[in-house]
Amino acid sequence: MKDTDKPLLPLSAFQQAIIGMAMVAMGAGMTINFVVVAPLARKAGLTEIEVAGILTLSAALYALLIPTWGRLADRFGRKRVMVFSMFAMGLTNMIFVLALKAALAGLVTGLSTFFLLAFVRLWFGLLAPGLQPAAMAAMTDATTPLTRAGGLGMLGACMSVGSIIGPAGATVLAPYGALMPIWGSIIFNLSAGLLLAFALPPTRKRPKSSTRPKPLAVRDSRVFPHLAFLFCYFFAIGMVQQTMSWFIEDRYKFTGTATRTADEAVVLHTGIAFACLAAGMIIMQFGFVQPRRPDPRKILPVGLAFVATGYVCADFFFPFWSLALSFFTIGCGAALAVPAANALGSLSVERHEQGSAAALLAAAPPSGFIFGPLVGATLYSLLPSLPLYTAAGVMSLLAIYALLVTSRRPLTPI
């Protein structure tokens, strides 16, 4: 093996797994708010658009500051930035929960509630974005050109897994209180920060003679169509995730019982829906995709059709079991569509550029979640079923594009 093919700053498999677990914790901590905060903030007196505005403003700040935190990671060390990011996320979420509890208790009312929650949530967008660029940079230095795409792809997959585990985990913790799922994610974030602090080696300087892979431009003609495709996909996902807890609350009109409050019932049933989605993803991923390794060009339109069908059925059929089954279908489709879209994006460039392509494609989910939740909340205020049908329409258009355009493009040889 040539020196140029050796990792610049190698990490053991265990250390890489710890970074992956931190990405899972980050994904869970970001998406749990759609299950818990959305219905409770509305109960505190905020409108749907105000709730989405708080989360959207924070997500926009988060996405805009990722490059800045990447430069800080290069200057002060990847480990320091990753540990700081996990603790910042846990602590800012803790302060946000306390502010929300104050609003629910009536200590803060009216427009003051919106400004308090928005101000507290902004600190998440300011302080927490460092994990993703620092982890990507650390994985880039810890891999060779041959293993880089797989390493960076693993980080993106971990973030996606976390985004599903967060809402699904609410099913387990909701019986202990409507806010318990967020407390669980806070403990997860802080624990991940401690593991990063103890498991990763001290910050090491990169060899002066080494050069990092040149990043791809966003408008690179080979990758941009795949980036735009994934942005549209996660834009649609964001519309539904933001509004699903409201949809379940307004449709089924839960009432309090001797064993649980109406708020706990909303969080529990929303968590069940997302748990079914997670089950569909796991079964499809490990029961079909992994053992058979199908052509991504063929499974992409099929997966998108599954997702679109699930969204339509979620509104068309009333019983909760049918909604849960619809989300299971969505999960099956997502397990086909997302890995296929990412794989096609990575394969669109030369082998030595695949790591850079994977890092660029990883920007699609947070970018989609900047606009999707706010648009979804606006549509929901007009008609509760509009986000589901709009998302289904977006998925249908993407499926048609994948069938007529993407499926006819040749795969770049690996």
Each language-model region and where it sits:
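Helix-loop boundary and gating motifs at the non-cytosolic
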Residues: 9-59, 225, 234-257
